[in-house]
UniProtKB/Swiss-Prot annotation:
<dbReference type="Pfam" id="PF03883">
    <property type="entry name" value="H2O2_YaaD"/>
</dbReference>
<comment type="similarity">
    <text>Belongs to the UPF0246 family.</text>
</comment>
<dbReference type="GO" id="GO:0033194">
    <property type="term" value="P:response to hydroperoxide"/>
</dbReference>
<dbReference type="InterPro" id="IPR005583">
    <property type="entry name" value="YaaA"/>
</dbReference>
<dbReference type="GO" id="GO:0005829">
    <property type="term" value="C:cytosol"/>
</dbReference>
<protein>
    <recommendedName>
        <fullName>UPF0246 protein PsycPRwf_0637</fullName>
    </recommendedName>
</protein>
């Protein structure tokens, strides 16, 4: 069983990693592809980034500097001195729910084996892959040698990595199921026809004025919470995710099918 999440635009560069898991740190599997993309980004001036990414001048300046500072080679890989594990660097609603900073070592190791973080720059990351700060959303129309956007750039690469990681978990006797907790923008980079697994997409609905609907802020946090729930309980069978009950959510069988699992939360529990 394997989970995928979207990354976050906001980054936590200041807080130290809370548990000693340095021997599990790794380089991103698709780092050479990231190098190729960063070469393109390094050629962009702040004004170019502002137009490409629809961001403010301040953010364009910040990310232009990040691009210039970004450096990786086989001789000088990412280390604790110049990078940070992805699961600890990403901030925002999803990662508030995941909250790796409060996780013990066993939980972090589970996450590292069962969670892929989709990324415009790095393709797909393990939580303990070392990365340097960046901004490159998957939907960005960055021209490259493969085409006009990042979906064309990544092609089958991300899916190939996920297939291999799912093979690793299924060989341990786990369900061969991908739990999709990523946004549509990011999951579009996974080629469903090439995926050697069934896909389940949890949907989180919150009650508002007597009606249930997806509220982005709550849904993002719930996605992170579900991955954390799986890690805390060392879940290996998808069926056990139906017991997810953090933050007041509960599984609704009559609204679910084999592809979409619906979880709801009543207004009183928000």
């Amino acid at each position: 069983m394997y989970f995928v999440l979207s990354p976050a635009k906001s980054l936590n560069e200041k807080d130290a990693v809370s548990v000693k898991v340095g021997n599990y740190y790794s380089q991103p599997e698709l780092i050479e592809d990231a190098q190729a993309l960063m070469k393109i980004l390094k050629s962009k001036e702040p004004i170019d980034l502002q137009a490409l990414m629809s961001i403010s001048d301040d953010l364009a300046q910040l990310n232009a500097q990040r691009n210039q500072d970004w450096a990786w080679s086989e001789d000088k890989p990412f280390t604790e001195d110049n990078a940070k594990p992805a699961g600890y660097l990403f901030d925002g609603d999803v990662y508030t729910g995941l909250d790796m900073y409060s996780a013990d070592k066993q939980t972090v190791v589970y996450l590292n084996e069962h969670l892929g973080i989709l990324s415009g720059l790095y393709g797909v990351l393990k939580p303990l892959d070392m990365i340097q700060p960046y901004r490159l959303e998957m939907g960005t129309k960055l021209k490259n040698e493969q085409g006009d956007n990042l979906y064309e750039f990544w092609g089958e690469h991300i899916t190939d990595v996920i297939n291999q990681r799912m093979k690793d978990t299924s060989e341990q006797g786990e369900d061969n199921i991908l739990i999709n907790l990523a946004s549509n923008e990011y999951f579009k980079a996974v080629k469903k026809k090439s995926l050697d697994a069934a896909i389940i997409t949890p949907r989180f609905e919150d009650e508002k004025n007597g009606k249930y609907k997806v509220i982005s802020f709550y849904a993002k946090k719930a996605r992170g919470l579900m991955v954390r729930y799986a890690a805390d309980n060392k879940i290996t069978k998808a069926e056990d995710l139906k017991q997810f009950d953090l933050a007041g959510y509960y599984y609704v069988d009559e609204l679910s099918d084999d592809k979409t699992w619906v979880f709801r939360r009543d207004e009183a529990s928000q």
